[in-house]
Regions:
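Short linear sequence motif anchored by a di-proline
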Residues: 1-208
């Protein structure tokens, strides 16, 4: 799964991404309606506003401020992840899977490894920062929809790679930079891109 990701401070590669989201016509509306400011650096958490890449009304790639978490009737906690293996079959995500796919740029994402304590009565958590090898930006795949006039998104997950499964059995669906323009294109079937998911990662212990 994925419940936190990180944006490096003063990263020149991220500057145009943040600038693009701030220039979006949606930016004033999101800032007025949602209490959280756009995450420009540091950890991004559920219900935060982050810069997201998606198609605009003219079907051209554009950056938007979006809120992390989809709400559903009768559920107090927002949904932040969706399984890439089954999202297309879920009524909540079927349309977004076909037409409203997005990319959430991050420096890396966080995952927690849970191991039993020495006495076996509790678990010991270890936090890891994970990112693709030889990549400065991690392109997380997501789905978005409009709720109350505001764009919200979930991050898609998949089975963890062999090198990461000891940390957690799930991980975000991440594509290489060359594939992201195809992911957000509604004319392309998303299943055609799943085999191109990044497979080589760096995982380092991180501070809580």
């Amino acid at each position: 799964m994925c419940c936190r990701f990180y944006i490096k401070e003063n990263d020149p590669d991220f500057a145009p991404i943040l600038e693009g989201a701030e220039k979006s016509a949606l930016f004033p509306r999101v800032q007025k309606a949602h209490p959280a400011p756009l995450v420009r650096a540091g950890e991004a958490r559920p219900m935060d506003v982050t810069a997201v890449l998606a198609m605009d009304k003219q079907q051209k790639p554009a950056l938007f401020p979006m809120i992390w978490g989809v709400t559903t009737p009768g559920r107090k906690i927002p949904i932040i992840n969706a399984r890439s293996e089954s999202a297309a079959e879920k009524p909540l995500f079927h349309e977004a899977w076909e037409k409203h796919r997005c990319i959430i740029p991050a420096s890396w994402y966080f995952e927690w490894q849970h191991l039993p304590s020495e006495d076996g009565r509790s678990s010991v958590k270890t936090k890891y920062a994970i990112q693709p090898k030889d990549a400065n930006i991690t392109y997380l795949c997501g789905l978005y929809r409009i709720e109350n006039g505001l764009p919200v998104f979930v991050i898609l997950t998949k089975e963890a790679t062999e090198e990461l499964v000891h940390i957690h059995d799930r991980m975000p669906l991440i594509l290489p930079k060359k594939a992201i323009r195809y992911w957000i294109n509604p004319e392309i079937k998303p299943t055609e891109l799943l085999p191109y998911a990044v497979s080589d990662y760096i995982a380092e212990k991180a501070e809580e």
